[in-house]
From Swiss-Prot:
The keyword Protein transport does not apply. Residues 215-289 are annotated as: Disordered. It comes from Arabidopsis thaliana (Mouse-ear cress). This is 18S rRNA (guanine-N(7))-methyltransferase RID2. The lineage of its organism: Eukaryota, Viridiplantae, Streptophyta, Embryophyta, Tracheophyta. GO terms for biological process: callus formation; lateral root development; maintenance of root meristem identity; root development; rRNA (guanine-N7)-methylation; rRNA processing. It is an enzyme of class 2 (transferase). Expressed in seedlings, roots and flowers. Residues 255-264 have a biased composition (Basic and acidic residues). Pfam families: Methyltransf_11, WBS_methylT. It is found in: Nucleus; Nucleus, Nucleoplasm; Cytoplasm, Perinuclear region; Cytoplasm.
Amino acid sequence: MSNRPELLAPPEIFYDDTEARKYTSSSRIVEIQAKLSERALELLALPEDGVPRFLLDIGCGSGLSGETLSEDGHHWIGLDISASMLHVAVEREVEGDLLLGDMGQGLGLRSGVIDGAISISAVQWLCNADKSSHEPRLRLKAFFGSLYRCLSRGARAVFQVYPENIAQRELILRQALQAGFGGGLVVDYPHSTKKRKEFLVLTCGTVQTSIQTSKNEYDESCSEDDNSDDEESEEVGVSDRNRPRKRQRTNTKVKGREWVLRKKEQSRRKGKNVPADSKFTSRKRRTRF
């Protein structure tokens, strides 16, 4: 049986009262969530001017990732589809405001009010069709489109994702770029199976070419024996993706004099009235005002 929760049941069913409390009470999960949230907040690259920002936590769950935002002095709102998770967050008295909703139906927030967004292990849920009316491509389109509208100009969105395969990764990237985002994929520990983490870093509006990383860059000169020490190596792989521009169609076939003469001869064989050939046939006319 697969250990991926999105393959077992829809999120609002999988994270019931029992699972929500079990998830929040696990010290291991709390530690992992804190580290991932700190990394996502770092990749947001918010200005270090001491001014609190208004952030969005997508798939906030019981507010574990939101605590990292609060500790950094920011205001935030959290969105989640599991009512049980949000009830636990209320019991824990998290500082952020909470919204119950399906991100696949759009966020429904005002335009340009969010200074940044993070999401920990949530976006890959949109790649599954839990209902007959669900189309992953359309749900991702609605999500990224509404997110682009609610972000302020130049703001970033960072998603920590666990795509099941390459097709899911490409689907998420494609829909993000089509919504207007620029950015790319940041991979921590790309050569480690256990520690590998993928972050989709998107920018609304102007694309910032530099991505701040706290991990050591991969040294290509390291020996092959070091590949087994996954726990000791700290590596980051960055793959930039820009929104592709539409290519202009160019007519590679130039219709010259021979083509015109051949077409005129075909018309004569069909009995049509065709002007006689001359030295001016197929010659380009002068431009006149």
